[in-house]
Amino acid sequence: MSSTLNMEQQPIQSHPAKTGAQPVQPVPASGRTRTLLLIYPPLTVPTSPPLGGAMLKGYIERELPQWQVKVLDLNLWCYGRVFAMLRDGSLRIPEQFMGNTSTEELLRVPDFVMGKGPADFYEDAAAYDRYGRLLATLTGVIGEHLGRAADDWKPGAPLDPLLAEALQLIGGEQADCYGVSMIFIQQLPVGALLGRVLRQQTGKKVFFGGSCFTAGTDNFLRWYPESADVIVDGDGEEPLKKLLEQDGSPEGVSGAVFWHNGQVVCNPPEYRRDIDAYGGAPDFSNLNLADYYSPQPVAPLLLSRGCYWRRCTFCVHHMSAGLTHRLHSLERVIEILRQMTGQGVRHFSFVDEMIAPGHFANLADAIIAAGLGISYYALAKPTKGFKPEILRKMAQSGCKYVLWGVESGSQRILDLMDKGTRVEDMEQVLRDAHAEGIANHVYVMAGFPTETRAEFIDTLRFLTRNREVLYSIHRGVFALEPGSPIFKNPERFGVMRTWEVTPTALGGRWMHECASGMTRQEATELLTSVQPYLRAFHPYAVMMAYFRDHALLLYAQRGIAAMRALPRHFPAWRYLTRGGVSRPAAVPPG
């Protein structure tokens, strides 16, 4: 890919800011004699600001008065540069990636998704799908290009022009040390390159962290041996503070992963029970929230650490917080929300692993009592604890939609997943949530070990039975994650053989073979064959399933009742038989 994009280096240009919410005013830097630059590398969708750096900035500047922390969203900067380069002709994207889309059409994307274009973000669904698809495609093309360019670079060779500009921008900050915070695996190659070059060219310390380091952190350091002085596994606040106090020495730093005498050393992480001690609202003062690719700012907030369930057999997400679940007090949550609403932010994504029904009820009560007037979305598991009265409180507190972990419509598969859910309970929760004015987005999975075609058809039947109360289907094919319960004990799940297909920085991509059920290829083909049906669930636009923050703003702006009134046209879903023959589904249309 690096050879297919034609880039010519140009002077750095910032994307013009839009009017609207003003950036939070920074804490005065007087008295701060040292600077830590926290970098969020490209490339991922830029609809909202990165949370990790803002949380660390607030904590470190409170705890270490001599340190000034600057947060640099290199991801957002990268999008601004890409569109500037398209505009001046120094970047050309081959037709095979963008089809017959003109450069002029592509250049309309930022204004549209920021709510500034002539087409209405909230009313023109066709325009939303068109520009949303262009943004998603551009993200994939540029992201793959940068990842390959970063991995292919050798010392002494010229850097990719965009990466060279990024390093020039970073160098201009004259920081005393650097942190790189990453969430998504596609950020890893660029982050590793930045760390490597910064260490070589400046001699300064470079620290890595972020929720992508859930497993395989030691493998990452072997894969990219010169990328970082220390990687922090787990909560970042106290380890980063200690690293700064010790001039980068990892001695005694919990969760530190580093080289020592030619070996990778992994200090065991520690998890502070009282997360209120980490402070209040994240400090977004270095970031203009109005510059993000949404009509109004949507701020991510983390109200807890870890997962209260921690038993899903396919999952490793909770591992970044260890086997813990720690909640902010409701008093601290309301304090954080008050701070953010005082800065003009009223839309939030609660990015907790998931919120339990009892805690959700208390959280909703606290938000209602505080009279905050916010809107938000969150993740949860549709258990029978979500009674109508709890869902009613959630809606009254500003919950516009929930991403529910449904996963399957087959009880046998749910039990193998150890989800702790029942098919009939999930249906009731979804119907009750809809009745109370909450939009339902659901996750489903195809190809769990030993799942048969008939069992995945059960999932499709589940969706069909409940499609009048479902607004979006987020779907994927099962992937074997290193460190997951299935990976550790495959025989228990009918997995006869596992093997590494492609080595990667975080432990490889793995395949598996089961004694029964679909192969991964069969599951992929089956899921692909029903995509037209699944895409029809969103009442407004297909791409709303891709941009979560945009879905929140749409529901807040137009209301759930208006969404219900929109017509939806479901094609008769068809699926592939084992022989590859398309068959109509034996399911009634309603």
Model-assigned labels for residue ranges:
Residues 1-47, 53-55, 61-62, 66-68, ...:
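Radical SAM enzyme core and accessory elements
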Residues 5-19, 23-32, 259-300:
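N-terminal [4Fe-4S]-dependent radical SAM core
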Residues 34-35, 43-79, 138-269:
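Glycine-rich beta-alpha loop elements in corrinoid/cobalamin-binding modules
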Residues 73-82, 215-219, 359-360, 412-417, ...:
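Flexible glycine/acidic-rich beta-alpha junction loops that bind and position SAM and/or redox cofactors
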Residues 77-87, 91-175, 225, 317-375, ...:
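Conserved Radical SAM active-site core
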Residues 183, 211, 306, 353-355, ...:
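Active-site beta-loop-alpha junctions enriched in small/polar residues
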Residues 220-242, 393-402, 458-480:
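Structural recognition of alpha->loop->beta junctions
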Residues 276-439, 461:
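Radical SAM [4Fe-4S] cluster-binding motif and immediate context
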